[in-house]
Amino acid sequence: MIQGGGLDTDLIEKPSRDPIINEADNGRSNAIGTIAMARTSDPNSASSQFFINVADNDFLNHPDKTQHGWGYAVFADVVEGMEVVNHIKSVATGSERYHRDVPSELIEITEIHISNAYDQY
């Protein structure tokens, strides 16, 4: 997976809004090309970090409403530009300060497009 949001390009935490309620029981699965909310071990802690699934990650799906069963809420799909996602996936990573898997080159999302295509689910 590729995780983003929450940190600026200097790996400093950005201000975020209050956490949201986990909606992983929405019927969506963490399949390749989906985008989901990242969170801590608290099921209702997602705020500004997200991840793009670069593989089918069924183990992240919602099996039940227990502490370990909540899963991760899928809220969007990559509908165009999966080749960009695959390029990001191929970038070498390392550790920087207390962060792991930091890309060796700056990767920054500068533009996204939101559509109502999600209404079909």
Segments from the language model and where they lie:
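Cyclophilin-like peptidyl-prolyl cis-trans isomerases
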Residues: 1-121
